[in-house]
């Protein structure tokens, strides 16, 4: 059984599949009452459950086994990034972030941003799809657009880094970061941060890396 379904409506001994998930299971995969599937909740929970009915609009499943904190990481990574103009590149970034286990993603709005707004629902759907396809149990927290200045000032992670291209020899991230910690990584083109003054970033304990 190598396919996951997603639901956040998890109760003591049963769960409810969202209509789109239930429709795929019942109409496409031809699941029947009594058939078993695996459901994840996006927060480390994994549930083996049996269909109790075949109603896509109100699909109940009986939980027969459950596990918590499956694949829980020993670190926390928060990525701040100015979203690319291309939908394909943005969706690729979301997919890879889920696959490698990024815990939080914030989209940064700057004077040079190629995209001034994002569709959170579409992005979340892509993240859920990637989680199921890669057999993961955690979804990253995905935040709406925020200004670069507000993001940097309000960032509360223990270790903070900025990917920055320059002629100076900046430290490599693997040599800069300590193990098993709480990280914030700000990623974008160099021009994005010119108006923020790099010396101010250093005063806010953001370290440059390449």
Where are these regions (language model features)?
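RNA substrate-binding interface of SAM-dependent RNA methyltransferases
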Residues: 70-161
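Structured adenosyl-cofactor binding patch, chiefly the S-adenosyl-L-methionine
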Residues: 181, 190-210
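N-terminal positively charged helical leader segments and presequences
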Residues: 1-68, 121
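Mobile, glycine- and charge-enriched loop segments
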Residues: 37, 62, 70-83, 177-181
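Hydrophobic side chains in well-ordered alpha-helices
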Residues: 25, 89-93, 197
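Short, surface-exposed acidic/glycine-rich loop or hinge patches that mediate macromolecular interfaces
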Residues: 84, 188-190
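A mid-sequence, solvent-exposed acidic-amphipathic segment
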Residues: 145-179, 183-185
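Conserved residues at the C-terminal ends of beta-strands
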Residues: 108, 163, 207-209
């Amino acid at each position: 059984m190598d396919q996951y379904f997603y639901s956040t409506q998890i109760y003591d001994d049963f769960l409810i599949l969202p209509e789109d998930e239930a429709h795929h299971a019942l109409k496409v995969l031809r699941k029947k009452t009594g058939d078993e599937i695996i459901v994840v909740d996006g927060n480390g929970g994994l549930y083996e459950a049996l269909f109790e009915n075949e109603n896509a609009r109100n699909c109940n499943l009986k939980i027969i086994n459950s596990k918590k904190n499956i694949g829980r990481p020993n670190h926390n990574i928060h990525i701040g990034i100015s979203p690319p103009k291309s939908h394909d590149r943005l969706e690729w970034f979301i997919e890879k972030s889920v696959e490698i286990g990024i815990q939080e993603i914030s989209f940064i709005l700057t004077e040079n941003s190629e995209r001034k707004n994002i569709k959170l629902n579409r992005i979340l759907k892509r993240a859920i799809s990637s989680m199921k396809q890669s057999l993961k149990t955690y979804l990253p927290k995905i935040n709406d657009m925020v200004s670069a200045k507000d993001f940097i000032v309000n960032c509360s992670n223990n270790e903070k880094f900025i990917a920055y291209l320059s002629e100076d020899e900046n430290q490599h991230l693997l040599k800069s970061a300590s193990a098993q910690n709480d990280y914030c990584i700000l990623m974008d083109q160099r021009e994005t941060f010119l108006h923020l003054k790099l010396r101010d970033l250093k005063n806010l304990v953001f370290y440059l890396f390449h």
